[in-house]
């Protein structure tokens, strides 16, 4: 099909307002992406002009397309490898970006490459040495290749034209567990900032991100383009997101969760349950499975192949519930999610913002329910101050969660399921009851 003359393509806002190449417009149209979002309108023209960019916009606003489209348009004008590097904090987000770039670039012979932990280093090194056009990576694994895989493998990075730091606030955050040393290793293998185009995207413009605006620049480079469109710095929780809390006794939190998932309003909703710890997520998945919920999980104790498989099952609605740690709180776009439950109240209000951002995306409606114990009140108050909105007490007509918990043997049923799940973990069995070696955390 000739995209330049396709009537549907002519009507696409990316062509009429942003001067995006016809082949890209046709690809976006095929994906049912016809109207650019605010962050895309602001950033795409400036990136095409060659300007460095700091783009701030809340979750679900289309930041990936905002950098992927200009990268692919510039690459098509001068296709060589390695043209661009995209760094992002989690494997799941890297996979999602890889799949989006692969889909958008389908009409061309563009080769993206995914570089993340949990997979074979040697096969990755071979693929990296073959000069893919766009590398999408987590900083830790790409830094490993830079440090250990040899000059022949990583020399292509020295010609990179564009680099993206996606979820830049997380990548640049200092402190324990910081990714910043690995990010610096990655950037040191690329051309200097004066010879490349640097794009930063985030839902939260932190001081570390803002500071990059005023860094010294080469004389031949225009000023950094900075846009902040309804970011989550100013409490911009989508108006379509309903925030509620449910008071729970600490000793019966699991029973309240089971009943909450089973109410008439919630029993069919695709839901993500967030926990603060991997052990909690592992236990909850096993327990909920015994209580006949269609459930899977996503956390760092799982092998990468299982993480990918579980996420694919949830996307395909083979599982209705995803139990996850904050590894799933950033960037993942699963449009069907209409319910987010905070089983544990996050310690950091920013983590709350990213968690609830998994629902009510792109104008859709969603609900976030936070289970609140007596010790969680101060955390909830800090969250409300951060998002500049009060949570409402959860309610459903004709439903008393507490009443259902104390009646009908729910406490006994949930208690037995929890004990069986704990025993399974102690015996070293997987969620299907099969004996296997003790899971180890992998980078």
Curated annotation (Swiss-Prot):
CDD domains: DEADc_DDX49, SF2_C_DEAD. InterPro entries: DEAD/DEAH_box_helicase_dom (IPR011545), DEAD_box_RNA_helicase (IPR050079), Helicase_ATP-bd (IPR014001), Helicase_C-like (IPR001650), P-loop_NTPase (IPR027417), RNA-helicase_DEAD-box_CS (IPR000629). Residues 240-402 form the Helicase C-terminal domain. Residues 44-223 form the Helicase ATP-binding domain. ATP binds at residues 57-64. A motif (DEAD box) lies at residues 166-169. Keywords: ATP-binding, Helicase, Hydrolase, Nucleotide-binding, Nucleus, Ribosome biogenesis, RNA-binding, rRNA processing. The keyword Nucleotide-binding applies. GO terms for cellular component: cytosol; nucleolus. Transmembrane segments: none annotated. It catalyses: ATP + H2O = ADP + phosphate + H(+). The Q motif is unique to and characteristic of the DEAD box family of RNA helicases and controls ATP binding and hydrolysis. ATP-binding RNA helicase involved in 40S ribosomal subunit biogenesis and is required for the normal formation of 18S rRNAs through pre-rRNA processing at A0, A1 and A2 sites. Required for vegetative growth. This is ATP-dependent RNA helicase dbp8.
